[in-house]
C-alpha cells in the first residue's frame, strides 16, 4: 500500500505545480481584457442603437463578405423593417425633451422665429425694421426652437404661407414628401455602415460622396431661397436694402438640381452600388425644385399677418432642411469619416463644409449651427457603436491599420492648420495614448516656472521610438478647443513668448449649450443671443462653448474658403463706416462681420477680385453714354454679365437688373486691374488721346466712314479697350471731350 501510494504521489507530483498554476491563476491577460472590453461595449451599444444593426440576418450576411462592403439589399431590408424610426430614437427623445424644457407655446415659438428674422434682416440688408428687444426668455430656448422645432415640433407654426388655398394644399403635400425623403436618406446613411472602421470600403465611400455632394447642393439652394425670401419681404414692407450686395447664390435651382442629377457621384460611378441612395437624393431635390416654383410664383397675403405667416413658414422650411443637412455632416464626423479617402481632407467633405460655412456666414444669425459634441450627447448610439466597432477591429487586426492611421493623421494636420500651438495635443491623436497613456520614460518635464525646458521620450508606433515634446498642461479630454480657466483669466504668456494654455476640466464644460459663435471662420455679432453667450474659444470645427464667458470678448477671424465652382462675391458694404469694435493686441485679429464694422473685402489680399462691385448707399452710379467697356478675346466675362457684343449700345445696369431687387449694380469685369479704377482709366485714356492729338495736329475726316476715331489704351493687364464714338472731330466736340475727361 505504501509503495503504491508512494508511486502514485511521485507520478502525480511531476506536473502538479504546472497544472495548478495554469488552472488556478486568474491573472487577466491583455487579450482577456480586450475581449471583456469589446463585450461590455457591445452590451452598452445594443441598448441605445437600433436592433436592426445587430439582427441575426444582417450579422450572417455580412460575415460571409470579406471586402468590408455592405450590399444595398441589406440596407434596403433594414430600412423597410425600421417603421418606427428606431434609427434616431435616442436623438428624437432628447430633442423633444429640449423643446419641452423651453416652456414656450405655439405663439411663443412664433414670436421667437419672427423676432429672429427681423433682427437677421436688419443686419443683413440694413433695412429699417423695428427691433422689439430680446427674442425669447433664454438663449437656450431660442436655439432649441430655431434648431429643433421644425423637425420635432408637434405641428407646424405657419400652415398657410400663400394667399390662395390651392397653393397651400400643394405646399403641404410637398412638405410631407420632403420629410419622407429626408427620413429615407437618414435611414440609408444609418444602416449602410460596414463592420470594420479600420478597413477601406469602396462602396461606402461612394455613398458618402453622394451624400456630401447632395449636402453641398442643398446648401446652395438654401442661399438662393434666402435671397428670394428677403427680396419679397422687403418688397412687401416697402423697404429697400441699405447694405447692397449681389446675390448670395447666382445659380438658379433648376441648374443646381440638374447638375447633381446628371453628374452626381453615384450616377457618374455607374456601378449601381448607390442606386437606392441616388434615387432618394433625387426625390428630395425634385421636391425642393417644386417648392422653388411655389415660392416664386404664388403671392402672399397683403396684410401684416400674411407677411409674417409667410416669413415663419419660410424659416421653418429653412431650419428643417438645415437640420437634415447638419445631421448628415455630424454623423460623418461621429465616425463615418474613417471610410473617406484622405479622412477630413477629402474633397467632397471639404466642399460640403465650405458650402455649409458659406450659408452660416450669410444666414447663421437666423439659422444656427449645432455643435457636434452637443449632437453626440443626444445621438449617443452612433458614437458608442463606433467605439465598439473600433475595439473589435483592434482585437482582430492586432494593431491600428495604416488606413485608419492616415485618417487620424489628416485630423492632426487640420488641427495644425487651425493655428493651435505646436506642442498642444488636444483631443484625439494618432498614437492611441488616450487618458491612461504610459508614463514618460526619461527625464520629466521642467516645472511650469522653470526657465529651461526638458524633453522626454514617449513610445511611438513601430519599433522606432521618437522624441516628442508634450505640453506642460494636462490634455483636454473633452474638447479640442482652447478655453479659458474657471477664474476667467485669459491665457498667460511665458518668458520665452509661448502661450501657456489653460483648459477646463471635463466637469466645467456646459454641455447644454448648443451653439457656438464662430463655429466657422467668421464671427457674427451677439444680437441673436444674449450677452452671456459671447465667444471664448476658437476652433475650425464644431465645439461647445464653455460656461465661463470671455472677459475680453476677443474673437479670431479668418477668411472663409470658397470652392472652385462658386462665384466669389463682395461682402456687404454698409453706409456707416464707424466701427464699434476696438482691435485687440492680437496681430492676427480681424474684425467680425457686422453692419457697423469695416468691409470684409477690404481685409482680403490685393489679388482678390469679387465678382460684383458693391455700391455704397447714397452714391449714384455714373451712366456711361456712347461708351462701352469691351473685353478682349483672352478675357473671360463676369459670371452674371451678358456675353453678347455691347458695341453701338448703351451700358446701363438698370437694363440688366430690371427685375432684381438690387438694381444699382453693374457687372465688374474680372480683367480690370484692381490698382486702377474705371474712372482713373477713363481719365488716363482721355489725357493720352489729347496729348497724341496735340503732337500729330488736327485731322479732318474726308468721308463719313472716317468720322469715327478709336483710341485704344492698354491697361496694366492688357484686357481693357475703350472705344469713343463721335459724330465729328474730337477737336470740334468740347462737350464730348469734357464728358470723357470728367470720368
From Swiss-Prot:
Top-level taxonomic group: Viruses
Keywords (A to Z) from UniProt: Activator, Host cell membrane, Host membrane, Membrane, Transcription, Transcription regulation, Virion, Virion tegument
Record field: compositional bias (Polar residues): 573-586, 697-716
Region described as Disordered: 437-481, 522-590, 693-743
Membrane topology classification: Peripheral membrane protein
Presence of the UniProt keyword Membrane in the record: yes
Gene Ontology terms: cellular component: host cell plasma membrane; membrane; viral tegument
Subcellular location: Virion tegument; Host cell membrane
Annotated Low complexity bias: 526-552, 722-743
Subunit structure: Interacts with VP16.
Role this protein plays: Abundant tegument protein. Trans-activates the immediate early genes.
Protein name: Tegument protein UL46 homolog
